[in-house]
Amino acid sequence: MCPEEGGAAGLGELRSWWEVPAIAHFCSLFRTAFRLPDFEIEELEAALHRDDVEFISDLIACLLQGCYQRRDITPQTFHSYLEDIINYRWELEEGKPNPLREASFQDLPLRTRVEILHRLCDYRLDADDVFDLLKGLDADSLRVEPLGEDNSGALYWYFYGTRMYKEDPVQGRSNGELSLCRESERQKNVSNVPGKTGKRRGRPPKRKKLQEEIISSEKQEENSLTSDLQTRNGSRGPGQGTWWLLCQTEEEWRQVTESFRERTSLRERQLYKLLSEDFLPEICNMIAQKGKRPQRTKPELQHRFMSDHLSIKSIKLEETPMLTKIEKQKRREEEEERQLLLAVQKKEQEQMLKEERKREMEEKVKAVEDRAKRRKLREERAWLLAQGKELPPELSHLDLNSPMREGKKTKDLFELDDDFTAMYKVLDVVKAHKDSWPFLEPVDESYAPNYYQIIKIPMDISSMEKKLNGGLYCNKEEFVNDMKTMFRNCRKYNGDSSEYTKMSDNLERCFHRAMTKHFPGEDGDTDEEFWIKEDEKREKRRSRSGRSSGSHVWTRSRDTEGSSRKQPPVENGGKSLPPARRAASSGDDQSRSSIQLPPEVGTSHGQGFSRPLHCGRVPSHAPPLNQMRPAAPGTFGSLQGSDPTNLHGSSRIPEAPPGEPLQHPPFAIQAPVGISNHRGSLLSAPDLSNMGSHVPSLQLGQMNCPSQDGNMYPPAPFQAGFIPSRHGGTPARPPDFPESSEIPPGHIYHSYKYLNRAHPAVWNGNHGTTNPGRLGPDEKPHLGPGPSHHPHTLGHMMDGRVMRQPIPPNQWTKQSSFLPHGVPSSGYMQPPCKSAGHRLQPPPTPAPSPRFRGPSQALRGAQGGESMMDSPEMIAMQQLSSRVCPPGVPYHPRQPTPPQLPGPFPQVAHSASVCVSAPKPALDNPGSTQEMTETHEPEEDPAEPLPGHEEKAASICSSEGVYLKQLPHPAPPLQASCTRQSSPQERETEDSQLKSDASDSADTYKTSKNKNTWPLDNSYSSPAVQGCLRDLSIVAETGNLPENGVVGEASPCRSEGKGLDGSGSEKPLCPRGKTLQEAVPCTGPNATTPPCTDPSLMAATVNQFSPLYMPGIEYSNSATQYPMSPSLQGLASMMGGKSSGSQPQSFPPRGFQANGPHPGLFPRYRPQQGMRYSYQPPSQPSYHPYQRTPYYTCPQGFSDWQRSLPSQRSPSGPPGSHPPRSLFSEKNVLSSLQGCETLNTALTSPTQMDVVTAKVVPPDGHNSGPEEEKMDESVERPESPKEFLDLDNHNAATKRQNSLSTSDYLYGTPPPSLSSGMTFGSSAFPPHSVMLQTGSPYTPQRSASHFQPRAYPSPVPAHPPPHPVATQPNGLSPEDSLYCCQEEGLGHFQASMMEQTGTGSGLRGSFQEVHRPPGLQMHPVQSQSLFPKTPAPAASPEQLPPHKTPTLPLDQS
């Protein structure tokens, strides 16, 4: 019955309404999501048929709760909400009359109620929570489609459960028409659902819209079915079919299925197959399970359909546990299936991404490997070109074939979006370029005839933009290829010389810049390296550091183009040049690379070393450097600009191949004023070696010509034979030396000698900055934790011709003196617990702290004529030292006792170091030369520690600062003792006091003579010594010495030492009075030592630390070569006191032995036992600058200094035309120099200053004989330059020395002095907290040089020692330790060895004479024994105190 008729519909008619199964299907489908009641179609049918108000009201209330998103709608209160939604949606939107205006819902006909229920289901899908609740459901599961169709056009529908409906075709329409109509209608409806059939363009719809479209499709489908039903019922127009229940039991399903078995039509056979295979088995199971369920009673149903869904759930759990379990299981299975599907999809996606990443990584790795291979080939090619050799075929044509990715990789959507955005930006930049107009549109043959015949793949910007808009570029490579094709086409059609081609090149550069900007670069994409000039960035740095370098710097840049930058010269088919050739080919370079250097500046055969340019064009004795070819090709072909902060490579001395003599490479030397008439600058080898197109600021060496700015006093260069420091990486290995991280210490010349692993700021570095060197192509960076960038120290590789024969690497550790008697030191080039591989590097120093002050002002750019003493550091040093120790106030610091050291270092004596001058008329005693030369060195007991001795001798010198970093305790070093400049009035007073103190000094000398057990050594000298020698030279010429010729020794720590001696003298004991220059302060270049100071005494304290290599104490007078604790920060610059000259002299290396069996290895060193450098300024220089001997050569024993060695060992000795000559012709000269020598001792022996102070030359001038001379040899000299800081309390220390006994020392015996630069004796460690100070804080009286040595009045030969010590072939004692460190003994004079440039003084001699100790016999080519010792006056044995047992130093016992 139809609803319009108003009667209750029969059950058959109710089953013919398609809305009923639609409502049941909807509730079943969205039951969980919308919290709808659970029922079957049969139950809904029964409720509608029986007019079950409660069931229908509960269903309506649940649907309205979802529509209004309110939980307070109940079956009792739903009427108002129902009226509201029907009024709004039914009447206003659909335009139908509102049936609820006339009656309530219960009074409406059944048909209308069913329609309202179905419409409420549609409204529920429009609620706001649908999108979130249905996001896990598939759209296909929401759609109901017929199972099939028979030949009559009837459709078979299955919603859910066990029922199947049949829709008969519309009456009056043929089966074909009905079928076609339904098919087209179905296709139209389905096409509205995305993802079903027709693909829709544009953005995918949102979920909510998707659900709405799904529901609307259902509505349309249902409406069509309803219209069919109504048409068949006669209530609607024609063209609609009728619905009826076909089957719901198992028998009915089987009958319907069997009815299609014998059918022959395709549709019916498909329908039969579907029903028989898919539906029939499942439907039978479902019917069987339904039959097993307990019959529900009416009260159960009433409870189930209560308005509150939660209460219904609880009742169901209590009363129907079986149904609840089944329901939960079903839901669980559905959820598991959905989760499993999601997991599978996610896993597959992750696997794809993983494979893509792996492929990309493999491509990148391969690209990087290929790039490294090509780079190595280029470097090898450049190296061969530099050698002038022919290139093998594989190196002739090096292609820059960057790896291209094979195939198109599908990127993620977001990656594609980013790439497309970047491509658009790049394209916009290219289009906006001024030269892009010829490429904007396709080429027209009207103005480009035959273009498309020549160009097969035309391309233009508009075509690329179209492809980009169409999404045809899957990756940027395609985009780049099209752009390159466009540029290639232009070049191909127009030729290289066309204006269009030039515009194409400009546009291509613009394109590359845009690509670099918008596409982040990937490693391995290309191996092209581009070099740009960077003048502006360097300008500020160069001006700040005070250097004047005239050229620009080549640095590496990723930028392929630079509109404002010069492009590097392009060779080899467009590749960027290797660094060496690139620099050489640049036309505006001021200096040429190794390939294009002129003969006097260029390298030999393209090696990385350049010949120094001499103004006089004097031939430099450079060996053929191809003999020094590195072990691996490309060792010197370091990339130009690989480190932008250091554009000149580390200077390396490659070892000669076995069997070839190692010839000394030439190095810049400095001419004295008077020969060259100006201080020219020499370009040192490391600066010319790998500098490429840039002449860097010459930090260590300068051209020996006026600089470009007209400066006649540029920084001083290295002396001949001196090899500047290497700055980058480990040194080159000999050909037979295996490459490993464990480089034995004997093979490496370490760049620094300091104990606490900190950089010393040396003079010849730039101020406060580091100058890192570049590593070569095959060179490894530093092995240890230290930085690869070091300051320019003066530690350099030595010349092999003056060094001991090397020993094989496998015998290094077998040497008895590998470390002191085999006992490693905690500071031996490594912090404790570091492996041997870490010995090579100093610790990282981020920035030079005030603790390690920068180089002196002269090296930072002070021009000639400016005194180093005027530098801010020296002024601050004067102020600080004046505050630390005012004259007359003894300074007795209380320092913690250093812990007892193992091995040969137990006897760290306290640092009371007072130099004693012999109160003997040495100037007129010719015999004093022999006495001073050789003394017995008493035996020393190294096992006699006095750890409990806390009372330090009064004069605690700063040389303890050398040991400070070696000792475990962190006590800060003492402040430098007071230094003051003596006024002329004071000097006169001091002169008078000097005579009165002479006798006391003599007694003290006798007492201390045997205490000093450090062997004599004079391998270095201090500014104080030089100043003293200069004063002595004046005295020697004037002859106005005091009657006894005694000048009290000046102790740098004199204010501290004053308490030791009762004289109460507060004035420096270096008075000139009427004769000498008034006591010049002993800290600067003018710091003078008394003329009577025994040079052997000075040498004595210098060289006891033979076996122990102590980094940092090699250069006793280097600028701040010694680590300083914070208490000495203000005094840092004092260590290398500034003098008037423009630059400190560079120093000669200890040469290699040219004909040694192992030419590639560095020979080990022998600490000097002879005197340090006592200087004698002759009246006129004897040699030209290039003929100067080095300041000192390989260290030797005390008696080795006088021996002439074979000529081939002299790296830069005087020419053969100059006969060997001694420094002194009169021994009284030497006697007057004892004060200087003692002062030299003060540089290194902080602990024995008081001991040496007591040393007195017998007044009668009688030679005490060999025994006393040998004993005198053991007398230690003070080792701290700090002792030059104050001469006030010299008498006090001299007198106190009489009472000083063995117990006064911390460990029982006087500590040895510093050796030639890096070794200790048995009692090597003085107490902590003392610092080596060299240099004077006072302005020198002469502004000729930094440190004007005033050593000896006349260059008269001295007598050789009577008892030379037996040495090995190169003059070294056999027990010497193996310290093949790069700058071992190199920087002894880096603070004080200044060139004499005083004008018109007449007291200057040649360089060798100025810096030559007494007794030196100059051999034309001999450099190993350049500084023989002179005999020193010694006290008789009966004058020596009985309580001190004579001992021999460790290296001579």
From Swiss-Prot:
Compositionally skewed regions (Basic residues) per UniProt:
197-209
User: Where Phosphothreonine occurs, residue numbers?
Assistant: T526
User: Which stretches are tagged as biased composition: Polar residues?
Assistant: 223-234, 637-649, 999-1020, 1228-1250, 1291-1304, 1331-1346
Q: Start and end of every Bromo domain?
A: 414-518
The record's keywords, sorted A to Z, are: Bromodomain, Chromatin regulator, Methylation, Nucleus, Phosphoprotein
Q: Which residues carry this modification: Phosphoserine?
A: S402, S551, S983, S1280
Q: Which GO terms describe its cellular component?
A: CERF complex; euchromatin; ISWI-type complex; nucleus
Cited SUPFAM superfamilies: Bromodomain
Compartment list: Nucleus
* Molecular function GO labels: ATP-dependent chromatin remodeler activity
The biased composition feature labelled Low complexity covers 1173-1187, 1202-1211
Compositionally skewed regions (Pro residues) per UniProt: 655-664, 887-905, 1352-1364
Q: What happens when the gene is disrupted?
A: Perinatal death with high penetrance due to cranial neural tube defects. Exencephaly is frequently associated by open eyelids. Defects may be due to misregulation of mesenchymal/ectodermal transcription factors. Fetuses also show specific inner ear defects, such as smaller cochleae as well as rotational defects of sensory cells and extra cell rows in the inner ear reminiscent of planar cell polarity (PCP) mutants.
The Basic and acidic residues compositionally biased stretches are 210-222, 985-998, 1265-1289
Q: Name one GO biological process term.
A: execution phase of apoptosis
Q: Which domain of life is it from?
A: Eukaryota
**Asymmetric dimethylarginine: residues carrying this PTM:** R1166, R1172
Q: Which CDD domains match?
A: Bromo_gcn5_like
UniProt domain comment: The Bromo domain recognizes and binds acetylated histones. Also recognizes and binds histones that are butyrylated.
Subunit structure as annotated in this protein's UniProt entry: Component of the CERF-1 ISWI chromatin remodeling complex (also called the CECR2-containing remodeling factor (CERF) complex) at least composed of CECR2 and SMARCA1. Component of the CERF-5 ISWI chromatin remodeling complex at least composed of CECR2 and SMARCA5/SNF2H. LUZP1 is detected as part of the CERF-1 and CERF-5 complexes in embryonic stem (ES) cells where it is involved in complex stabilization but is not detected in the complexes in the testis. Interacts with CCAR2; CCAR2 may form part of the CERF-1 and/or CEF-5 ISWI chromatin remodeling complexes in ES cells.
What is this protein for, i.e. what is its function?
Regulatory subunit of the ATP-dependent CERF-1 and CERF-5 ISWI chromatin remodeling complexes, which form ordered nucleosome arrays on chromatin and facilitate access to DNA during DNA-templated processes such as DNA replication, transcription, and repair. The complexes do not have the ability to slide mononucleosomes to the center of a DNA template. The CERF-1 ISWI chromatin remodeling complex has a lower ATP hydrolysis rate than the CERF-5 ISWI chromatin remodeling complex.
Name of protein: Chromatin remodeling regulator CECR2
Could you tell me the gene encoding this protein? Answer: Cecr2
